[in-house]
Curated annotation (Swiss-Prot):
Mode of membrane association: Peripheral membrane protein
Annotated localization: Cell inner membrane
Keyword set includes Cytoplasm: no
Keywords annotated in UniProt: ATP synthesis, Cell inner membrane, Cell membrane, CF(1), Hydrogen ion transport, Ion transport, Membrane, Transport
Chief location bin: membrane
Quaternary structure annotation from Swiss-Prot or TrEMBL: F-type ATPases have 2 components, CF(1) - the catalytic core - and CF(0) - the membrane proton channel. CF(1) has five subunits: alpha(3), beta(3), gamma(1), delta(1), epsilon(1). CF(0) has three main subunits: a, b and c.
Organismal lineage: Bacteria, Pseudomonadati, Pseudomonadota, Alphaproteobacteria, Candidatus Pelagibacterales
InterPro entries for this protein: ATP_synth_F1_ATPase_gsu, ATP_synth_F1_gsu, ATP_synth_F1_gsu_CS
Domain of life according to the entry: Bacteria
Gene3D superfamilies in UniProt: 3.40.1380.10, ATP synthase, gamma subunit, helix hairpin domain
Gene (name only): atpG
GO molecular function: ATP binding; proton-transporting ATP synthase activity, rotational mechanism
Pfam family, one: ATP-synt
Membrane found in the keyword field: yes
Stated name of the protein: ATP synthase gamma chain
């Protein structure tokens, strides 16, 4: 049985932890407001650009001179997967959920006899995936030192991917990230960004009608690389908001659990103290009676 001193130390320790988790919850809440606002602002732009690309591509995706970013390499042998996770922990199941979805895709690729290549964005993703897929990881990226998510970071990733694609180092590129819904819910997403899915283009072809100048081919050649960077940027914004929402929820649960533990330990401390006092009184009374 724990002594009174041990219980006092445990209560003090849990209270100290509770203060930390409460502070982290407040910091995450402040960051969440900004991250959520950025993610919501970025959605209309990325969706509209993607729709324009899909509309343009519906008419030329079968042409021999169609951009490779649209038509692909003609092969489906090497798959490049970009997995977005966090650089910091204490965010609940945020990283675990997206890693789980990515691993399901990895297994499917392996079962089909295709080659897998992985780029991890965020140190937590690398730490988890290196145990099984170390040989498949071709690049690890971290924005730990960046205070905010910015388009230039996404553009750097986009340019690197396009350069590798032009060197025919992969045939298909898919990005994995968490889409922010609310503080409690973040939905793991899987989005193919190279080549553009022709099925999506066909579905979207009748939604909007545009007149293009000079022509679709030239506009597509300029817009496709920008669209890839835009879709990566959107994924990064969604992931950032999801991370802060998950961390806020996790720290809120930790703070409540710490409070409950303090209550239980306090009750145990009071009972132990009462038992010690009762024991001392009995010993005093017994000693007095013996005299």
């Amino acid at each position: 049985m724990a002594t009174l001193d041990d219980l006092k130390k445990r209560i003090a320790s849990v209270k100290s932890t509770q203060k930390i988790t409460k502070a982290m919850k407040m910091v995450a809440a402040a960051k969440l407001r900004r991250a959520q606002e950025n993610a919501e602002k970025g959605r209309p732009y990325s969706e509209k650009m993607n729709n324009i690309i899909l509309n343009l591509s519906s008419g030329i995706s079968d042409k021999e001179n169609a951009p490779k970013l649209l038509s692909g390499t003609g092969e489906d042998k090497v798959h490049l997967c970009i997995v977005l996770t966090s650089d910091r922990g204490l965010c609940g199941g945020f990283n675990t959920n997206i890693i789980k979805k990515a691993k399901t895709y990895f297994q499917k690729i392996s079962d089909e006899g295709k080659t897998l290549k992985i780029i991890t964005v965020g140190s937590k993703g690398y730490d988890q995936l290196k145990r099984v897929y170390k040989d498949a990881i071709v690049e690890r990226i971290s924005f730990k030192d960046s205070k905010t998510i910015n388009y230039l970071d996404a553009e750097k990733v986009g340019k690197m991917i396009i350069e590798n694609f032009e060197k025919e180092e992969f045939d298909v590129c898919t990005i994995f990230y968490n889409k922010f819904k609310n503080v409690i819910t973040q939905i793991p997403q899987e989005q193919q960004i190279i080549p553009l899915k022709t099925s999506e283009a066909e579905e979207n072809s009748s939604e909007d009608n545009y007149e293009f100048e000079p022509d679709e081919d030239e506009i597509l050649s300029n817009l496709l690389p920008k669209n890839i960077s835009t879709q990566i940027f959107k994924a990064m914004l969604e992931n950032s908001a999801s991370e802060q929402g998950s961390r806020m929820s996790a720290m809120d649960n930790a703070t409540r659990n710490a409070g409950e533990m303090v209550d239980k330990l306090t009750i145990e401390y009071n009972r132990s103290r009462q038992a010690a006092i009762t024991k001392e009184l009995i010993e005093i009374i017994s000693g007095a009676e013996s005299l």
